[in-house]
C-alpha cells in the first residue's frame, strides 16, 4: 500500500506514526521535505499538539522557516562538531536581529546580508532590545564569525 503513495503522503504516514507512538524522544530528519504548503501547516499543528514537558522532539532540517514557531532551542553542527547550542530566549538576549538602512554598519554587527528592504543584520544586543529570532541569519552569523559568537555565549 505504501508503495502507491506519493513522497509527501509517505512522509505524512511516517510522521503521524512517529507522533502516535507517544515516545518520550522522537528524532526526525527533514520531516517537511516533500510536503506541500498545506501539509507543512498540518505538520506544525500536529507537532505543536503532540509536544509537552515530557516529550523531546529533535528535528534535523534545512527548512527552518517551516519550524521556527515550534523551536525552543537551536543546535548548529559543523560536521560532527556542535558549534552552537542555545535556548532561543538566550539567543535574543545576546543577539539582535534587525533590518537596517544600507548605511548602518557599526562594530556591533556580526553578520549582514543585502535585501530589497535593507540590510538584514545580526548584532550584539548591547541595549537589551527585543527582536524576533531569524534562524537563517543566526546560522549564517555562526559560520561567518564562529569565534565571536562563541565568545558571546561562553
Per-region residue spans from a language model:
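Helix N-cap at the start of a conserved alpha-helix in ABC-type nucleotide-binding domains
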Residues: 37-39
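ABC ATPase nucleotide-binding domain "signature" loop
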Residues: 33-35
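ABC ATPase nucleotide-binding domain "signature motif"
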Residues: 5-12
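Catalytic Walker B motif of ABC-type/P-loop ATPase nucleotide-binding domains
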Residues: 26-30
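Hydrophobic anchor residue at the start of the ABC signature
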Residues: 15
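ABC transporter nucleotide-binding domain
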Residues: 43-122
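C-terminal coupling/interaction segments
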Residues: 109-154
Amino acid at each position: 500500500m505504501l508503495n502507491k503513495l506519493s513522497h509527501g503522503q509517505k512522509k505524512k504516514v511516517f510522521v503521524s506514526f512517529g507522533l502516535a507512538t507517544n515516545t518520550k524522544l522522537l528524532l526526525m530528519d527533514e520531516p517537511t521535505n516533500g510536503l506541500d504548503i498545506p501539509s507543512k501547516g498540518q505538520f506544525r499543528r500536529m507537532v505543536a499538539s503532540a509536544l509537552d514537558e515530557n516529550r523531546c522532539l529533535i528535528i534535523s532540517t534545512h527548512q527552518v522557516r517551516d519550524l521556527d514557531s515550534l523551536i525552543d532551542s537551536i543546535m548548529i553542527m559543523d560536521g560532527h562538531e556542535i558549534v552552537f547550542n542555545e535556548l532561543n530566549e538566550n539567543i535574543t538576549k545576546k543577539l539582535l536581529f534587525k533590518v537596517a538602512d544600507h548605511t548602518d554598519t557599526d562594530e556591533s554587527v556580526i553578520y549582514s546580508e543585502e535585501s530589497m528592504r535593507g540590510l538584514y543584520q545580526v548584532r550584539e544586543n548591547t541595549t537589551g532590545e527585543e527582536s524576533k529570532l531569524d534562524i537563517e541569519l543566526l546560522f549564517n552569523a555562526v559560520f561567518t564569525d564562529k569565534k565571536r559568537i562563541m565568545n558571546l555565549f561562553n
